[in-house]
Curated annotation (Swiss-Prot):
One of its GO terms (biological process) is ADP transport. This is Mitochondrial coenzyme A transporter SLC25A42. Gene3D superfamilies: Mitochondrial carrier domain (1.50.40.10). GO terms for cellular component: mitochondrial inner membrane; mitochondrion. It catalyses: ADP(out) + CoA(in) = ADP(in) + CoA(out); 3'-dephospho-CoA(in) + ADP(out) = 3'-dephospho-CoA(out) + ADP(in); adenosine 3',5'-bisphosphate(in) + ADP(out) = adenosine 3',5'-bisphosphate(out) + ADP(in); AMP(in) + ADP(out) = AMP(out) + ADP(in). InterPro entries: GDC-like, Mit_carrier, Mitochondrial_sb/sol_carrier, Mt_carrier_dom_sf. It comes from Xenopus laevis (African clawed frog).
Amino acid sequence: MENGIKESPVGLNKNGALAILPTPLVSEGHKNHKSVLNSLTSGALAGAVAKTAVAPLDRTKIIFQVSSNRFSAKEAYRLIYRTYMNDGFLSLWRGNSATMVRVIPYAAIQFCAHEQYKKLLGSYYGFQGSALTPIPRLLAGALAGTTATLLTYPLDLVRARMAVTQKEMYSNIIHVFMRMSREEGLKSLYRGFTPTVLGVIPYAGISFFTYETLKKLHAEHSGRTQPYTFERLLFGACAGLFGQSSSYPLDVVRRRMQTAGVTGHTYGSIIGTMQEIVAEEGFIRGLYKGLSMNWVKGPVAVGISFTTFDLTQILLKKLQQISHIQR
């Protein structure tokens, strides 16, 4: 086992003579099953840790995004301070339970889908066992984000509603679903879906592309196959910065459309929403409201997310190897 040579079992054949029996191999299906489970587990943990770390900043950003009030770092600080003084420290994480209900499946699906799309595209383009070229690398990230968004979108909408409303309006996640379905119709659960997907495609594509590219360049120049933890955090931070900056206006639009039912506005389309925001608040102040906060929140969250995923993947693989050796 330790020298890398697999010993084949010896037994008797049908004639009674000694013969080498075929070695029982782990099926490809079993390997893929373990790989998928590892990716789902690592992705779920990565999403939960990252989002919890930046939840107060995320909630503050959403509140500014869905209002016409001018954003500034000073006003953001005042909002956080007022929330803390009026409602207590834990109120800064209001809506985080809804966030976890969305983020855990979203991150699990996104990271798992990314691993599967990498294999699929690698097989298609003939890059199996080696790093993908830039276009397939970008495509794998975009497809992963789109898949996760399609499957978990209503949970994102619920999180946005809980973040911008008083506790008395929606008591829990189920209450949000029931009240929206009854008062606004089932279609309301996918309100803002189009700008979300249009924003996710460049965001996820560029984020995964940047992170994978930086890791590849690092391996080529350093001679180390695995970056240190602080290097992973730095690569993830760069990925988050580029990804979120590229899709931010669509993020503002989707938040306005998601929360239209509780803010008194009636946003009907992406173009119409953009025009109304620009007319009322200006192009930069409206469509890029809260971006400076995202330049703090986004890189931190994405850095933690990618790093947690990678390290959890490595840990799970080591545990499985130890378990296999002990057998």
